[in-house]
Amino acid sequence: VAARSLSNAVLVLTGASSGIGAAVAEAAGAAGMRAVLNGRRAEKLQAVAERVRAAGGEALAVPGDVTREADVEELFAAAAEAFGGVDAVLANAGYGLEKRFDATSMREHRAIFETNHFGTLLTLRAGLAAVRAEPGGLRHLLVTSSCVSELGPPRFGAYAATKAAQDAVAQALRAEVAAEGIRVTTIHPVGTRTEFFDTAAANSGTDRSLADTNTPDLFTQTAGHVARRVIAALKRPVAEVWPSRPARFAFAAATAFPGLTAWGLARAAARMEKQGR
């Protein structure tokens, strides 16, 4: 299948001020795309926009919060006003939480779902309407999920639950809009060298992430590597992007052998408890 041209295509990205979102924005600029960037940190968002322009693309920064429907509507309205329409959407906004289940409050559970899952739903709803209005465009919706959408690692149960929820919605949506020629892709990064683990530790009230220190190099990657895989998926759409092939096989095996997985996760939990004391 021939690769689709991304030149002048309009990509709306949430969570674009850092990490994977910022890396995808820059890669999109290098591919000649026009990137509409959303995030809560306006100064960082503007800095990313400058890097997109330096890479060869166009950029528009639209600060906002994906948990607020009015902000999401404003984001897509700004994209349409600036560039005439939207070709593709990457719902990337989200954060991590690294806490035992019995130490996680219901407020924390609801808050992470509000951003990671319901923020994604708001983005996808607006994004679906936008790409439907462009019959000649890329018509592509993408979601930054995670490898842990496949299982619940110790101390990451709340976070993993949001990613599993994203996956379920994306899978259903993929089937529902396939006949319209609209593509839906989920991205499943492993431990990515971004602010993620630092933020997860901060949200958990600790000064370091036990998950980060226990993640083998084989299951870590750079945001730039993930971004290159996202751009490749925009050119040649696929249902899922797993930037780490070893992780894909490992998580498939984990699903196939639940008893072995339970044993391995229990060992990991015991090791983290020992290190956390």
PLM-predicted stretches and their roles:
Residues 33-48:
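Conserved glycine-rich Rossmann-like NAD(P)H-binding loop of the short-chain dehydrogenase/reductase
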Residues 63-74, 106:
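The beta1-alpha1 cofactor-binding region of Rossmann-like NAD(H)/NADP(H)-dependent oxidoreductases
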Residues 124, 162-165:
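Active-site helix of classical SDR
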Residues 179-245:
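SDR active-site lid
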Residues 100-101, 105-110:
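Substrate-binding pocket helix/loop in short-chain dehydrogenase/reductase
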Residues 17-18:
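Conserved glycine-rich cofactor-binding loop
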